[in-house]
Amino acid sequence: MTYSDMVTIKFIFDIASPNGYLCHKVIPNYEKKYSVKFNYEICLLGGIHKLSNNQPPMIANAEIPNKFNYFDVEIKRFVELHKLTKFCLNPHFPINTLTMQRGALVAQEEGFLIEYIDCIAAGMWEDKKDMGDTEILINHLNKSGLSGEKILERTSEPEVKQKLIKNTEDAVSAGAFGVPTFFLHNQIFWGKEALREMPDYF
């Protein structure tokens, strides 16, 4: 099978979401198992929520304790199933990921997106760092062999800023209301549980 023959899945992604992190971690094996390709669409989760009139689960479910607690159970179940032993909740959550997401667009343009996401994902959801702090973010990128200063310098470029806005608006226009969202054959799938459902539609 050539690359052009592969089924491609658009992945609406922001590292702000722990479920986005969990999906990112299992995607490499998923791609090998099903011979599919995920294309990351870098968006801003806060913007998606605002444009779709949605709220983060921790706010939307704050007055529904059973539902709020279920999300914790369901994450633990996914973590155990996929042996994602490094995952941990970040005590600084919620974290402003605007700079990181702009950096992801820079990395995507320059050809090292997955390496970049691996790096910021570890900082956010394994090392418990306050990745919204510019100095911490730069140091973390540098320690991973990426040029934090150069990446962040480009995040102020108007084209990068506008690209993130457009990606976010386009995602909501297509039907997205949160992360992780997937688009397969023009059908929308939401949540990490969609990874089990999508093979029926390949």
Where do the protein language model's features map onto the residues?
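Eukaryotic N-terminal low-complexity, Ser/Thr- and Lys/Arg-rich leader segments
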Residues: 1-3
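C-terminal cap of thioredoxin/glutaredoxin-like
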Residues: 5-10, 14-37, 119-202
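Structural alpha/beta surface segment adjacent to cysteine/selenocysteine redox centers
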Residues: 22-124
